[in-house]
Amino acid sequence: MTYCRKANQTSYPFILPDLPYAKESFKPHFTCETFDYHHGKHHNSYVQNLNNLLKDREELQKKDLEGIIKWSSKNSEVTVFNNASQIWNHTFFWYSIKPHGGGKPSGKVFEQISQDFGSFEQFCEQFKQEALGQFGSGWVWVVYNNNKLQIIKTSNADTPIVNLMKPILVCDVWEHAYYIDYRNKRSDYIDIFISHMINWKFVEDNLIQ
């Protein structure tokens, strides 16, 4: 099972995927400097690290990225897991946002949110509280699990796919995701993420596939 074809990569050596939009298009909510560091340096470093870790590991070179994540988690290969998972998580995040996104979804996503959280407003409040409650670095996810949507948070490089949960949306709450533009105001960043960034079409595609 592939959890997300856009976030997965099928073959070694792995690459830094291009952003699915121009980095300038997120002004004023994200500056180009944020993308230069977050995508060009942080994300890229995970790619380079993983390729170096696998250069003499032919058995792992045959796996796709999701396969490496699952294998390394099961076999306690922490360094391999951290870098592989961070590649996947970041790519999933880039698709979770888009210029002029956010606001209220429609269609199947809105119906599912209303059913599982009571209202879109209650969903937003719970999402924000989970994001603010993540101590230190991590991620806040919306997953489809046991036939319903859930909001969960993971620390550091952890990812829900190792627990057989289907991610449909993620917000990066590592400080490098927002510190250049928002400093220590994670709350402001989360508000902007919800109101101006979420790519609801990507969320819908993940929900129905």
Curated annotation (Swiss-Prot):
- Biological function: Destroys superoxide anion radicals which are normally produced within the cells and which are toxic to biological systems. Catalyzes the dismutation of superoxide anion radicals into O2 and H2O2 by successive reduction and oxidation of the transition metal ion at the active site.
What Pfam families does the record point to?
Sod_Fe_C, Sod_Fe_N
**Into which family does the record put it?**
Belongs to the iron/manganese superoxide dismutase family.
Q: What class of enzyme is it?
A: oxidoreductase
Recorded protein name is Superoxide dismutase [Mn/Fe]
Q: Which UniProt keywords apply?
A: Iron, Manganese, Metal-binding, Oxidoreductase
The molecular function terms in GO held by this entry are: metal ion binding; superoxide dismutase activity
Reaction it catalyzes: 2 superoxide + 2 H(+) = H2O2 + O2
Q: Which organism is it from?
A: Rickettsia typhi (strain ATCC VR-144 / Wilmington)
Q: Which InterPro entries match?
A: Mn/Fe_SOD (IPR001189), Mn/Fe_SOD_BS (IPR019833), Mn/Fe_SOD_C (IPR019832), Mn/Fe_SOD_N (IPR019831), Mn/Fe_SOD_N_sf (IPR036324), SOD_C_sf (IPR036314)
* Domain of life of the source: Bacteria
Cofactor note from UniProt? Binds 1 Mn(2+) or Fe(3+) ion per subunit.
- Record: residues binding Fe(3+): 38, 90, 172, 176
Mind telling me which PANTHER family this protein's record contains? SUPEROXIDE DISMUTASE, SUPEROXIDE DISMUTASE [FE] 2, CHLOROPLASTIC
Binding annotation for Mn(2+): 38, 90, 172, 176
- Name the coenzymes or cofactors required: Mn(2+); Fe(3+)
State which Enzyme Commission number(s) the record gives. 1.15.1.1
